[in-house]
Amino acid sequence: MSNKAWGGRFETQPEEWVDDFNASIDFDKNLIKQDVQGSIAHATMLAKQHIITDDEAQSIINELKNIQSDFEEGKLKFKASLEDIHLNIEHELIQRIGEAGGKLHTGRSRNDQVATDMHLYTKEQVQYIIELIASFQETIVQLADQHVDTIMPGYTHLQRAQPISFAHHIMTYFWMLERDKGRFMDSLKRIDISPLGAAALSGTTHPIDRHLTQELLGFANLYENSLDAVSDRDYIVETLHHISLTMVHLSRFAEEIIFWSTDEAKFITLSDAFSTGSSIMPQKKNPDMAELIRGKVGRTTGHLMSMLVTLKGLPLAYNKDMQEDKEGLFDAVHTLKGSLRIFEGMVASMKVNSNRLSQTVKNDFSNATELADYLVSKSVPFRTAHEIVGKIVLNCIHKGIYLLDVPLSEYQEHHENIEEDIYDYLTPENCLKRRQSYGSTGQESVKHQLKVAKALLKDNESK
């Protein structure tokens, strides 16, 4: 007799190496909590609908809990010959309680069973990711609060462009994460749907109650189409996309952390707790955590591409190709959660070298736009002002000086309307103060931005 749940149709057994290739237990054992949760809801519903007895249901439920506990305590080992988490649990259940265990699968297929597990898992993980993002945002806001008046060079093309507030710069990542969080929150509408009861693809002849299992499992909605219920993996693609994009944002931040911590920049000092050394160069302090996060975006994006290609051209309904949805999702979720925790600790513990930042911004031409704006305030057309300032900058480069070093007489050779007040106008501090357009880097604008950000975080906490 075959030990396969589907063995009745077959005359020969697969060889062991075929079982190993076919099996998913090595990774879908991670779904034991969700599988037991779904089976308990299903057993409860079967009893309620008088498909099995109350005693049978209670026996099933009690032993499912014992199986989960035994596995988590290392007392139970699953077998590749039983393929997956579903059949391993069912086999163990029947071994323990006999015939009643074989009734659990009534009105259910592994197709809707695994879909239910994956919906439960993805929902739980997305909710946790949302919490991690919000926590990291809190850390960013706290750091920004301390550095509203800290001035640093703003860059375009990795060339110094204009003076900006350090708070304004790092708050950019708050808003990236806010969009990421919003995407995850919105995706819950498409994750929080119960496929349980769809069976293999067409529903079941048994008088099941899908609304009851939906309620027991805490799903917000039901799939309206049984074929769609077992075929849908859109929510996994969507989750992988949101993870990948969040990782892209973390990667961009990591690149800046790496640059800021170089001896050439010295804008920040990373904590030893988030750095490593060299096995040959004793002086080294490497930003390995930031580098790892920057690199890990490759694997999460790879999982997204893999899932999209796996689904391309798949006919309805379930196909074994769908077994490939799990490892990538599990790894991507693990990667993002770890990256968010590491990044929060790294940012919370890093030292911002305010004096170095302010000194750096005094030795460049990032106030050149300010000089052009000054001329515009003297009724000079902007394009003309741009040309004049370009010539002044070129002259300064030849002389090895900066705009604040140019004598007034030399300024007036370029335009007679330039007066003594130009020197106050061009200080980095005043460059910031004058930028008060909504969302700009000026102190008052940044303070308002922080107020809005704090209100958003408080609002999210109350939901």
Swiss-Prot record:
Sorted UniProt keywords: Amino-acid biosynthesis, Arginine biosynthesis, Cytoplasm, Lyase
Any Gene Ontology CC annotation: cytosol
Annotated localization: Cytoplasm
Pathway the protein takes part in: Amino-acid biosynthesis; L-arginine biosynthesis; L-arginine from L-ornithine and carbamoyl phosphate: step 3/3
Matching InterPro entries: Arg_succ_lyase_C (IPR029419), Argininosuccinate_lyase (IPR009049), Fumarase/histidase_N (IPR024083), Fumarate_lyase_CS (IPR020557), Fumarate_lyase_fam (IPR000362), Fumarate_lyase_N (IPR022761), L-Aspartase-like (IPR008948)
Entries under CDD domains matching the protein: Argininosuccinate_lyase
GO molecular function, one term: argininosuccinate lyase activity
One GO term (biological process): arginine biosynthetic process via ornithine
Keyword Metal-binding: no
Top-rank taxon, per record: Bacteria
EC number: 4.3.2.1
Pfam hit, one: Lyase_1
Keyword Signal set for record: no
Reaction catalysed by this enzyme: 2-(N(omega)-L-arginino)succinate = fumarate + L-arginine
Stored PANTHER family: ARGININOSUCCINATE LYASE
Family, similarity comment: Belongs to the lyase 1 family. Argininosuccinate lyase subfamily.
HAMAP family assigned to the protein according to its UniProt record, in alphabetical order: Arg_succ_lyase
Full protein name: Argininosuccinate lyase
Organism: Staphylococcus epidermidis (strain ATCC 35984 / DSM 28319 / BCRC 17069 / CCUG 31568 / BM 3577 / RP62A)
Gene: argH
